[in-house]
Amino acid sequence: MSKVSSIFDTPAPDPRPATTENGAAAKPAARKKKSPAAATKKQLIDQLIREMSQDEDNNDSVDQAPPAKKSRKKADSSGNNNTSKSSVKDKPAKPKKPKTAGLKIKLQDHRKHKEKLRKSLQGVENSRQAAASTSMLEASFNGDSLKDRSNHSTPVHHKGAKAAKKNKNKSHIMPLPLTFTPSKVVVKQEPKTPRRPTMLNVEASSGSLDSVEIGREKFSWVIGPSTTVDEFMAQFWEKKPFLVQRNDPTYYANLLSRGKIDEMLRNNNIEYTKNLDVTSYREGVRETHNPDGRALPPDVWAFYEEGCSIRMLNPQTYLPGVYEMNVKLQEFFHCMTGSNFYLTPPNSQGFAPHYDDIEAFVLQVEGRKHWKLYSPRTASEVLARVSSPNFTQEEIGVPILEVTLEPGDLLYFPRGIIHQASTVPGHHSLHVTMSVYQKNSWADLLELYLPHALSQAAENHLELRRGIPQDLHQHFGIVHSDNETPTRKDLIKKIKSLVDKIFSEEAIDVAVDQLAKRFQHDALPPLLTDQERAQTAYGANYAFNPDGTVPLQTAFTERTTIRLLRRNIVRLVNEENTLRLYYHTENSREYHEYEPNFLEVDQDAALGVELLVKIYPETVAIGALPVEDKVEFAKSLWEKGLIVARGE
């Protein structure tokens, strides 16, 4: 039998000074409406056509973008300047590759193209019966590891040859609401979860093609079985800790083990500091013991035997189980999903008390570890945006929760929750900390929004461009902050009225695009099923003819059906008077190893992308795309691994 400690109900008095708020549990979220992916294709197309009609009526909100240059020069990594003659703009990569045709750079009147897209959406519905194979990929992407891609197609953007940076994705744990001083724990009895033969196939039951739904199923597995995703998000997310005690030591066993760690160290060039830390916390002193160079097994295990903790900063790069979990969860959360693992010997502690800037999910894999959680000390530390320094035991107060995790258990706590953990006598500990929502708050969005909104407002409002009063400095600043003169009060009213002019709905779109663009750089490359690989560029078959030609055996026609590989695989962004299509199929499993990947497209090609985004996970025949050179457009996306394609 497993027990799931779910809800920290009755708040106990806070023994520390009353500097924090009392966080009440949120009401369960209302059931969401069916997503477009769950509706019939006809309903989806009708809905999109109505949206296009409304957009056409609201002409004042659509800007006419100036035409962009047909080509531009960019320096490659060796410092040479190259001019791309291809209709696809890119920053040059090192080896010269065949030209990718299809996407020109030219911004035109958006309203005309919206009308074209609306007609194309109607055409998709009309041709639905004619396209016999519009349902692609019978199973979700459940776990074949992505092989190294061959560089046979021309990159549409430049992937910078940036040296691998020091990995910053360290164990961080996201902030949490203010004082939740728990006491009573509701315990539910559940049958023991049956052992899963392979972690890579446990979510295949729904058969969904929507990558967000597949990610939701993976998250349900992480927090399950007795609490649903909706219940968790309504009652615990960013509010208070959540504990699951499963009594199932095999639940997370396929993620990693000491044996897999040893194999990883032997077969890969794991470096101290960049990939792995050796730490200790003794008598109130936190130390890092990293030597230089490669972390070889004899040295790492010697540190471990001496009582040091081992922290791996990017296990998803080397361990397939962790990679499979993270790559699915990033689709659900639509933000960077990181992981660290921590291996701690018996009777020891590796880290001082602290809080982190991420939402933390602790997945206990081996051994036992005793955890202590503490409320944020002040209101400003609730859902903290920056991780804390190390604290002394005297600075953190009394624990709100103490628990010993055993294999198969889960502990979640929001950012800002102070925590520390140590192994118990006679038991080592191995756990994975999965982290999400770093720098993904409303404040982070508004930091992107305000510069755009202010710039736009200054163009539209003369009052914002007028000069400030000559005597403004005599009424504001530290020296004058306690003044209550009539002039100061009038100026405050004036400034408030100017701030009111800054709001811009268009700037919200720009800011969200920039946030989503950041995700494209942060994201792990997608994990493909065998069937997906066969229908993408990664599984392309070529004929090696006696005459020396190497033709592609996959024929693209207007009856070929396509769809995006993942819901969040691309983001169309308007920046620098150019439409750019950011994507992450060419990312490395190592965080920010390369510069962001993007294609530069014209308005015609952008409408084709917009159609694919809006009908996902449905497919569309190439002949129904609202672009001029339909087949070349589809090939350009296919060559970058962005779509799956199925012939007649």
From Swiss-Prot:
A biological process term (GO) from this entry: negative regulation of DNA-templated transcription
Keyword terms: Chromatin regulator, Dioxygenase, Iron, Metal-binding, Nucleus, Oxidoreductase, Repressor, Transcription, Transcription regulation
Compositional bias of kind Low complexity: 17-28
Region span, Disordered: 1-168
Main location: nucleus
UniProt domain JmjC: residue ranges: 308-453
Basic residues: compositionally biased ranges: 109-119, 155-168
Cofactor note: Binds 1 Fe(2+) ion per subunit.
Binding site for Fe cation: H354, D356, H419
GO CC annotation terms, alphabetical: nucleolus; nucleus
Enzyme Commission (EC) number: 1.14.11.-, 1.14.11.27
MF annotations from Gene Ontology: 2-oxoglutarate-dependent dioxygenase activity; histone H3K36 demethylase activity; histone H3K36me/H3K36me2 demethylase activity; histone H3K4me/H3K4me2/H3K4me3 demethylase activity; iron ion binding
Broad class of enzyme this protein falls into: oxidoreductase
Domain of life per record: Eukaryota
Catalytic activity entry: N(6),N(6)-dimethyl-L-lysyl(36)-[histone H3] + 2 2-oxoglutarate + 2 O2 = L-lysyl(36)-[histone H3] + 2 formaldehyde + 2 succinate + 2 CO2
Segments of skewed composition (Polar residues): 123-137
InterPro entries the UniProt entry points to: JmjC_dom (IPR003347), NO66-like (IPR039994), RIOX1/NO66-like_C_WH (IPR049043)
Similarity comment: Belongs to the ROX family. NO66 subfamily.
Role description: Oxygenase that can act as both a histone lysine demethylase and a ribosomal histidine hydroxylase. Specifically demethylates 'Lys-4' (H3K4me) and 'Lys-36' (H3K36me) of histone H3, thereby playing a central role in histone code.
Protein name in UniProt: Bifunctional lysine-specific demethylase and histidyl-hydroxylase NO66
Source organism per UniProt: Culex quinquefasciatus
